[in-house]
């Protein structure tokens, strides 16, 4: 590289791009519904196990446990409803953004975070889905940076076709940059 091609001009804060200019695409509504269903089923199992423990006739429960088990059941049910409501808010706040040179993922309700990865630094992209995701046609897209063992971030709940399109875009974009 010649010295003439290199430049390192200062940039003033006014010249920086506006962070609000980044548009985040929300995750699929199907993902939000499936996540809610999974949370509710989990808490239903927990509350049912507590109810069965309380009403079962085979083993005598200690008096203290018998006294507080109804309150524990109510607390577990309330906690289940609260965690499900929080999960809906958290899932609705998740989103991804694809720009010409980078890829970003936003998450969090109380503590929000945005993770950005330059496309040129992406080593590879993986599509993963478990049995529930597969049943509802959803995929998780995992973005791995060059030099890292773990994924930089994962975007859950993408429709299968959209996840394939994004993966293809990132891989072809990386190939074009490698040939420059």
Residue ranges and their predicted role:
Residues 1-120, 124-180:
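N-terminal basic, Ser/Thr-rich segments that initiate or prime the first beta/alpha elements at protein or domain
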């Amino acid at each position: 590289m010649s010295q003439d091609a290199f430049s390192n001009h200062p940039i003033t804060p006014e010249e920086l791009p506006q962070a609000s200019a980044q548009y985040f695409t929300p995750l699929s509504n199907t993902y939000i519904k499936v996540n809610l269903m999974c949370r509710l089923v989990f808490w239903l199992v927990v509350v049912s196990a507590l109810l069965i423990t309380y009403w079962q006739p085979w083993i005598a429960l200690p008096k203290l446990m018998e006294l507080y088990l109804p309150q524990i059941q109510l607390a577990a049910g309330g906690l289940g409803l609260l965690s499900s409501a929080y999960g809906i808010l958290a899932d609705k706040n998740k989103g991804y953004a694809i720009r010409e040179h980078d890829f970003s993922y936003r998450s969090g309700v109380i503590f929000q975070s945005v993770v950005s990865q330059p496309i040129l630094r992406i080593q590879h992209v993986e599509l993963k889905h478990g049995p529930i995701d597969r049943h509802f046609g959803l995929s998780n897209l995992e973005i791995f940076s060059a030099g890292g063992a773990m994924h930089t971030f994962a975007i859950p709940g993408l429709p299968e076709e959209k996840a394939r399109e994004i993966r293809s875009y990132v891989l072809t974009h990386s190939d074009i940059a490698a040939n420059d």
